[in-house]
Every structure is written in structure tokens, then in C-alpha cells.
């Protein structure tokens, strides 16, 4: 969805978010609001933030002027001891799940994703979609968040590549594609599917 109109950051994540995939022909969408390294760290399904509590609205700001003051959540710049990885290249905003992000965020606590569970989450959603739609032709756009920064593979993949977090995230991505392939096989869809 980007950073808002002309980079203004003006998207109200507490309302129906549009335009999005549903406005360009997708019957169903389950996406990230932006890249994994930016706020807000929430999933959006059919234009609505998943698990958003209306009593804890989301506020996003990419233009917080005082970089040394926290904006809602602690920041990587001011609170490096709270991070699980060193920040770099502007990734020093709000800390969520130990990861310093680009941008600043307040609210939306119940809607926050778990970085280490993202591959499983998107895989499960995709498998669910395949099984629910297997009796008719469908188009599934399965876009992997790995190996984009912050590269947070699930612990079961940590150290598997011998090449650090990026290599481990690639191993996780490869596993995810394999699981999707197995689903197409088990649902007897593989012979009638373009991958």
C-alpha cells in the first residue's frame, strides 16, 4: 500500500483501506501494509486491518521530527538495548518484536504480526485459499516476504544455511514453496496449475 498519498503517510488504518488489491480485480486479499521493515506491522484482509481493536487505533508517522524522542513505541535510535538486531539505513524508528523499523507507530497492539511466524502465516492463508477454491479456476498471487529485511526466519530455520539470517530466510522461502507445491499435489491440482 505504500506510505500514503504522494508519500504523505496519510492512510487511516482504522478505516477501510482503499485502493488495494480488491479494487484492481482480486476477490480476496491478505497482505502486509508495507514491507516487513516498515510500520505499520499489521496484516490487511480485504481492506481491513486484521484483529484491530477500535479502542486502540493505529497511528503511523514517517515524518517524526525529534528522532531522539519515542513516538508511541520505543525507537531503535533511543533504545538500542531493546532491539534483537542492530539498526541500519534508517531502520531506527519504532521497535516492534525487537526489530527497529522505518517509521513510527502507535496503537494497534492486538493487530501486530509476529515476524518469525510470517512465512507460516502467509503459507497457511494460501493453503486455506487453495483448498476453499479448488473446485473452480483461481489465481493466487503468493508473494514471499523473505529475504527482504529485516530477515527474521522462524527459529526452526535459524542456522540452517550457514550463511546468516539472509541464507536462513532463503531456506525458509524454499521450504514454503515446497509446502505450497505439496498442497497442490495433495489437492490433485498440480497437473492443471501454472506455477
Model features per residue range: what roles?
Residues 7-13, 110-137:
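Catalytic-adjacent loop/helix segments of enzymes that bind and process anionic phosphate/sulfate esters
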Residues 22, 122, 153, 166-169, ...:
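Stable alpha-helical elements in mature extracytoplasmic
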Residues 104-120, 159-172:
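The substrate-binding groove and active-site-proximal loops of carbohydrate-active enzymes
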Residues 24-27, 133-140, 188-195:
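Loop/turn elements at helix/coil->beta-strand transitions in domains of secreted/extracellular proteins
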Residues 172-195:
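Metal-dependent active-site segment of extracytoplasmic phospho-/sulfohydrolases and closely related
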Residues 40, 45-48, 126-168:
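Active-site His/acidic residue clusters
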Residues 1-108:
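Catalytic-site neighborhoods of secreted/periplasmic enzymes
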Residues 27-30, 41, 127-131, 181, ...:
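Non-transmembrane alpha-helical segments in soluble domains
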Amino acid at each position: 500500500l505504500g506510505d500514503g498519498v504522494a508519500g504523505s503517510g496519510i492512510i487511516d488504518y482504522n478505516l477501510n483501506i482503499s485502493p488495494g488489491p480488491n479494487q484492481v480485480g482480486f476477490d480476496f486479499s491478505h497482505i502486509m501494509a508495507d514491507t516487513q521493515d516498515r510500520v505499520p506491522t499489521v496484516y490487511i484482509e480485504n481492506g481491513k486491518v486484521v484483529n484491530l481493536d477500535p479502542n486502540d487505533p493505529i497511528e503511523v508517522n514517517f515524518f517524526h521530527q525529534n528522532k531522539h524522542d519515542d513516538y508511541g513505541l520505543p525507537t531503535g535510535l533511543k533504545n538500542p538495548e531493546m532491539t534483537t538486531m542492530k539498526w541500519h539505513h534508517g531502520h531506527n524508528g519504532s521497535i516492534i518484536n525487537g526489530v527497529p523499523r522505518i517509521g513510527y507507530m502507535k496503537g494497534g497492539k492486538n493487530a501486530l504480526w509476529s515476524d518469525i511466524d510470517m512465512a507460516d502465516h502467509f503459507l497457511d492463508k494460501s493453503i486455506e485459499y487453495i483448498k476453499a477454491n479448488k473446485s473452480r479456476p483461481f489465481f493466487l498471487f503468493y508473494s514471499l516476504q523473505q529475504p527482504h529485511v529485516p530477515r527474521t526466519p522462524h527459529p526452526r530455520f535459524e542456522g540452517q544455511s550457514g550463511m546468516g539470517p539472509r541464507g536462513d530466510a532463503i531456506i525458509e522461502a524454499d521450504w514454503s514453496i515446497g509446502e505450497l507445491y505439496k498442497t497442490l499435489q495433495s489437492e490433485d491440482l498440480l497437473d492443471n496449475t501454472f506455477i
